[in-house]
Structure formats: C-alpha cells, structure tokens
C-alpha cells in the first residue's frame, strides 16, 4: 500500500522546517569561526587562520542556502524541535570538524614543528586530524562538553586551535539552540518553547522564551568574564614570571572551559601543567561557578542579594558533598600513597592534610563533582578504590540542575532521596494524616510529589541504563590490560577531560600516526596525562 499524498506532503513540510532551523544554526556557527580566525592572525598562525576562514565560509554558505531554500516552512512543533536538537548537534559537530581537517592538511611541516615546545620530541597533534574521524571526535567532544580529546599534546596545536577548542566547549555548555534563539530569530511562542525545551531545559527566567534565552547567555557571558578576570589576577599573583600574554590567554580559555564544565585546557597536563599547589587552589572556584544553577545567578542579580546562593538547596548539598567527598577520597589516597599511622590521631590528620593525598583529593573530587574534569593527578595510576569512589561518589550525581554540568544532577538525586524517605515516613502516619512533601522552599501535594519523584527517578534510571550499556561496549572493545574500573570510569557519561588509559598506548599512537588503527589512536586521545615525563 503506497503512502498517501498528504503523508508525503507532511514529511516534506516537516523536513523543510528542520532544514531551515539547522541551516540558521550553521550560519551562526560559521560566523563564530571568525573569532578563532582573529586569534590565529593575532599570533601569526596564518595557515590556521586560513583553515578557519575556509571552514567558516563553507559552514555559513551551506547553512544560508539551506535556510533560504526552506524559509517559508512552518514554525516548529515539539517533534520538529526534537529532531532539530538531535540533528543540529550532529551537523554542527560535522562542520566544526572542518577547521581541524583543513589545518592538518594545509599547514607545512615546518610550521607544525614551530607549534611544538622547544626541546620536545613529539609531533604536533594537528597531524592527528588528518584522520576525519579524529577531527569529528574532537569537535563532538567539544560541543557536547564531553572533554575527551585527540589533541594528545595540547600546546602543539597552536593558539588558534587552543582557543577554538575552548570556544566550542563554551558554546556547547549553555546550548547552541539557546544561543540561536537569543541571537538569530524570534519564533512564535509555542515554537520557541519547543526549540528551547528540545535541549532539555525547563527553567524560565523571563516571560518569553527568547527573553529567557538572552538572560541565560547574559549571565553566562558575565560569569565567564568575571572568572577570566579572577584567574588572570590570581595567576599573575601566584606565578608573576609566567608572562602577561600567556596569563591572559590561559585565564580566558580556562574561564570558558571551566564555566562550561568541559575541561579542555591550554596545558599539556591540564592544571597539573602549572606544577603549583597554589594554582590548583586558584582553579577550584572556576569549577564551582560552572556547577551552580544559572537561575540562582539570575535570582542573585535580579534581587541584588548574594544570599540567594546560600538559600539554594542544590548549592548547600553540593558543598556538603564537597566536604564529605574530599575527606573520603583523601582517605583512599592516603592509604594508597602510604601515609603512615603512628598511633597519634591528631598528628596523623595533620600529616594527611599536608600530604599529596589531600592535594589530589581536594582538587580531583571537586573536579569530578562539578564534572569539569581538570586534572592534577594521573588518575589512571590510582588504585581501583579511589577511582570507584569518584565515579560513584561524585561523577554520577554531578552538580546543579540548570547548570552546565553532567551527571544525574543534585536536584534529581535530592528528589529521589527525599521521595524514598517520604514514602517510608508515610507508612507510619495515621490514615487521614496530611502527607505533603516539602522539597527546598516548595511544598507538593501527594499527586504532585509522585509526579516529581517519578520524573526524577525515570531520568536517573535512563542515565544508569546508558552507563551500563556503555560499560558493556567498552568491555568488548578495550584491550585486555584494562580493568573493570577503567571501563566503568570511561563509560560513565563524560563532562570533562577524564581519562585513565596508559601512557604506553599514547606513545604507540603518537609515534605511528600514519600506521596505527583509528580505534587505537582514538583511545590515545582518552588518556590521562603521563605519570612520568
């Protein structure tokens, strides 16, 4: 039985709506490639600049043509918006890979060698992107703020691409569709709501969705700017000999990747590249700001009351988790590194507090909880207990709902926990007792409470299901030398530059770029920084 003409017409109409909106998004993405183009020109990286110019032009041209051809399509309904969100990320990542591929092929060997720090014995990581799959991986990882990277040696890609990697994470953190709603067009009310919700957002800061999108981006830009200023000043005070130019460049890039909780870095060994305990401490606030819900920032600004941060239950729970988690992870690491106990509990606590175990436990647990993923330790060298502690004690839950973090989110975990305690307490209540559920500053009737608990539980179950499936996939493809802990660590949905694979695999792929398999070079990008130089 052949499909009806009306069915074909509906499919064509729906396709035109999707193509138009994805095309508009690509016009924006192409225009944003002008920013790393300017950075490349500033640092006289001419071939990188040319790659961004070509890529931006192609992306904007294709997007513009698609938009013009389908400009008369109807406004998107919810099912259109879901398709736009799904395909929009895929198409954007594909076009976002173009600069990597083009630069890898057009940049002369002598120029690539100039990107490699003096005295280093490795090649520029731009060569990795001669494989289009590697370039797509890098782009997708950036836009989704996953943070896994094929830039094995980050400084060797040049300033233009260091900026580009940070920029795509920053854009992906707040959401490309939210950005397009704020800048490109103002669809009708229901259409705007559909597009906005298609990225999984529910917070509404202003009466209109476009107003909400703009408010989100104003807050996002403002907080990022403040974090950049803070990092620049703090770095200058801690490392006055680091250089003003590099201080500012690192500060802006780390502000973008910190606020997006994506975890890309300008340094080869992430934050450990500074080799400074003080710089570890400096970067902790930059991670925490990204894990706080944007509506809380909006409330604090609109009410001009910083106490809004303390009133938010997610913030309170998050800092409570920091305290408990840092103590727990430090205890695991103290046993691993062998801090001796001599019978004096006070003295032992003092030695632990000044040990490498506390330094790593403090930074890495907060990095895991906020899902930023910056590293100051070679996590692949940790014992399995410490690795499992940060996976199940921090990464799975993540930071606040309404922030850029990954994980189940504190709010959902809080609702599920309160729901369990509520259900248990109801067993002991009299038959006609009022059993409303209070969560934060809101009180829910029984039906509302059940809906909230069901929604949070469903999302948590779906998240854990994806984790389990990913775990089995990794167990099937990982080489035999990797443990179950490695697989669990890598399979949990990422939001940061977390990796636990061994240096030997990194060396193998780096030394044989032209002969190693795509899959093994792919795993090379998922490594933690080498444990020894």
Predicted regions and their residues:
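Membrane-proximal intracellular helices of multi-pass ion channels
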Residues: 1-533
């Amino acid at each position: 039985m052949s499909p009806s003409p009306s069915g074909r017409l509906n499919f064509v109409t729906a396709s035109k709506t999707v193509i138009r909106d994805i095309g508009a998004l690509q016009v924006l993405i192409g225009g944003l490639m002008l920013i790393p183009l300017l950075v490349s020109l500033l640092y006289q990286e001419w071939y990188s600049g040319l790659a961004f110019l070509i890529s931006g032009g192609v992306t904007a041209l294709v997007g513009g043509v698609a938009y013009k051809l389908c400009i008369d399509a109807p406004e998107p309904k919810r099912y259109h918006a879901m398709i736009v969100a799904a395909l929009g990320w895929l198409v954007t990542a594909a076009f976002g890979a173009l600069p990597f591929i083009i630069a890898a092929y057009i940049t002369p060997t002598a120029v690539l060698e100039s990107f490699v720090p003096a005295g280093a014995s490795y090649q520029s990581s731009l060569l990795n992107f001669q494989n289009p799959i590697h370039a797509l991986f890098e782009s997708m990882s950036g836009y989704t703020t996953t943070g896994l990277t094929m830039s094995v040696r980050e400084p060797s890609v040049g300033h233009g691409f260091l900026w580009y990697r940070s920029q795509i994470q920053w854009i992906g953190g707040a959401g490309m569709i939210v950005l397009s709603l704020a800048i490109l067009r103002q669809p009708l009310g229901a259409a705007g709501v559909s597009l906005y919700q298609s990225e999984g957002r529910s917070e509404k800061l202003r009466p209109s969705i476009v107003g909400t999108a703009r408010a989100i981006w104003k807050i996002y830009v403002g907080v990022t700017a403040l974090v950049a200023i803070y990092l620049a000043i703090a770095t200058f005070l801690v490392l006055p000999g680091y250089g003003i130019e590099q201080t500012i460049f690192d500060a802006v890039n780390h502000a973008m990747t910190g606020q997006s909780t994506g975890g890309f870095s300008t340094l080869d060994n992430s934050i450990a590249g500074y080799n400074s305990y003080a710089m570890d401490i400096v970067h902790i606030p930059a991670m925490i700001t990204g894990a706080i819900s944007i509506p809380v920032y909006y409330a604090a600004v609109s009410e001009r009351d910083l106490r809004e941060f303390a009133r938010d239950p997610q913030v309170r729970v998050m800092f409570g988790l920091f305290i408990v988690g840092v103590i727990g992870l430090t205890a695991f690491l103290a046993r691993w590194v062998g801090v001796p106990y001599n019978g004096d509990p006070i003295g032992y606590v003092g030695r632990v507090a000044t040990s490498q175990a506390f330094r790593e436990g403090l930074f890495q647990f907060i990095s895991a909880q906020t899902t930023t993923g910056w590293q100051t330790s070679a996590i692949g060298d940790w014992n399995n207990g410490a690795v499992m502690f940060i996976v199940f004690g921090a990464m799975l839950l993540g930071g606040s709902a309404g922030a850029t973090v990954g994980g189940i989110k504190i709010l959902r975990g809080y609702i599920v926990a309160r729901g369990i305690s509520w259900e248990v307490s109801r067993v002991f209540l009299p038959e006609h007792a009022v059993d409303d559920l209070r969560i934060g500053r809101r009180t829910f009737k029984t039906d509302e409470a059940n809906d909230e608990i069901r929604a949070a539980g469903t999302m948590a179950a779906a998240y854990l299901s994806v984790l389990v499936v990913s775990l089995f996939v990794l167990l099937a493809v990982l080489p035999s030398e990797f443990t179950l802990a490695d697989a669990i660590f890598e399979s949990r949905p990422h939001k940061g530059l977390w990796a636990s694979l061994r240096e030997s695999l990194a060396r193998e792929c780096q030394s044989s770029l032209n002969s190693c398999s795509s899959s093994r070079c792919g795993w090379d990008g998922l490594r933690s920084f080498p444990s020894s130089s």
